[in-house]
């Protein structure tokens, strides 16, 4: 094996209230197929350390420090050429991954290079970049490899992040952009994007209209949503030609227009799952687990648990069968304490079942069967499993939400794609168990 080791400095941006700027918290390294995160000792020893992920927290401070110092914990090191799960979830998928690999000149499965390529525009307040060559191999990195019997002799070369490259998780084609007047620019001159531009697909040219309508449906119920609007192709300066007229522009809640970064993580990261495990352990169990996290750890638990339950019911009513663990998130406004992130990526996937073969959307169809069958007794049991109190009050609020959706959504669906109209109207008219007394 080559004795060259490559490494990146790992930073978290501080909240503006704490003076802003960024704090180094550790290093990411690659030695052959070994990919590891090594945290700085001052970060480990700081009881007020900024939160990278709930997956790195233990039951108490001593447990947390033990995790952060661990030599072999899978949350810190892997030997198969992949990042530990938290960092895997930062990487794009599908076309977005292929595009980033082309920009970097690396293979799509080279996870070290992909993360390094997009190091200045990652999800949340995280940033990574190469260490200046003259600094040599960081002691904390060299020490771990030496204790494992690995002969680390020389630093390998790592290029700086690709200008304007971004890592946006998900499979739908999207670009990171900034808004300049009425224009949306992907060529950002190195600035992190504050807007995500999402494109439709040839299979679903109405995807943008579908998602925008679902944002409107959710917003009409008072749910806390990311801000989204439909723009024309002429309003966006994209790096490549696209055959679509409409683009969905979504304001990021982790990267603000003034350059502020707010840390966030997907629930998939918080629970320690790899991207391929985004459907978790099943709809009801995952919802109960997320509810429990929000109730016990949020700095606004009453507001967030009510919001979470309302989103669950809204997703059932609108047929959003792709609300997996990567489409729910936590934000850390103070850099430490989580709260439920705004709603994002609401899509009526059930509308795509029409005209598809029975083998297409198999996972989503199975989820849809569970959603449509979920009645009030099962919902009550889920809330109880999550450990929430005042269950009758929660159920009363959710019953009222169903009535409001039945009253208000038909007007909002008037200009929606026809398949979306038919799908949601059928659900409101008795197609899901929650519309029954």
Which ranges hold each PLM region?
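Phosphate/dinucleotide-binding and metal-coordinating scaffold of catalytic cores
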Residues: 1-325, 329-437
């Amino acid at each position: 094996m080559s004795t060259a080791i490559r490494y990146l400095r790992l930073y978290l941006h501080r909240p503006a209230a704490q003076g802003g700027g960024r704090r180094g918290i550790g290093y990411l390294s690659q030695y052959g197929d070994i990919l590891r995160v090594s945290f700085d000792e001052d970060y480990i020893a700081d009881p007020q350390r900024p939160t990278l992920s709930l997956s790195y927290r233990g039951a108490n401070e001593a447990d947390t420090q033990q995790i952060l110092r661990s030599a072999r914990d899978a949350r810190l090191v892997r030997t198969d050429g992949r990042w530990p799960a938290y960092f895997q979830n930062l990487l794009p998928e599908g076309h977005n991954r292929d595009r980033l690999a082309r920009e970097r000149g690396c293979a799509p499965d080279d996870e070290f290079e992909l993360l390094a390529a997009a190091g200045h525009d990652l999800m949340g307040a995280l940033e990574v970049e190469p260490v200046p060559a003259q600094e040599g191999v960081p002691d904390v990195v060299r020490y771990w490899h030496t204790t494992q019997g690995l002969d680390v002799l020389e630093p390998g070369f790592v290029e700086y992040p690709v200008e304007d490259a971004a890592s946006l998780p998900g499979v739908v084609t999207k670009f990171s952009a900034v808004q300049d007047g009425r224009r949306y620019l992907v060529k950002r001159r190195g600035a992190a994007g504050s807007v995500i531009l999402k494109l439709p697909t040839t299979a679903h040219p109405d995807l943008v209209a579908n998602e925008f309508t679902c944002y409107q449906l959710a917003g009409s119920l008072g749910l806390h949503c990311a801000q989204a609007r439909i723009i024309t192709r002429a309003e966006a300066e994209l790096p490549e030609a696209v055959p679509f007229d409409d683009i969905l522009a979504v304001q990021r809640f982790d990267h603000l227009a003034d350059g502020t970064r707010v840390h966030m993580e997907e629930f998939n990261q918080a629970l320690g799952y790899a991207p391929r495990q985004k459907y978790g352990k099943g709809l009801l169990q995952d919802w109960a687990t997320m509810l429990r996290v929000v109730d016990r750890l949020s700095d606004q638990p009453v507001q967030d648990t009510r919001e979470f339950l309302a989103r669950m019911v809204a997703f059932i009513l609108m047929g959003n069968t792709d609300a997996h663990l990567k489409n729910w998130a936590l934000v850390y406004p103070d850099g430490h304490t989580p709260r439920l992130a705004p709603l994002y990526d609401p899509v009526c996937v059930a509308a795509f079942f029409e005209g598809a073969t029975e083998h297409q959307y198999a996972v989503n169809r199975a989820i849809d069967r569970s959603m449509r069958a979920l009645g009030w007794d099962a919902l009550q049991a889920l809330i109880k499993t999550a450990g929430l109190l005042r269950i009758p009050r929660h159920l009363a609020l959710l019953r009222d939400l169903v009535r409001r959706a039945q009253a208000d959504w038909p007007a909002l669906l008037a200009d929606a794609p026809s398949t979306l109209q038919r799908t949601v109207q059928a659900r409101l008219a008795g197609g899901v168990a929650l519309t029954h007394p």
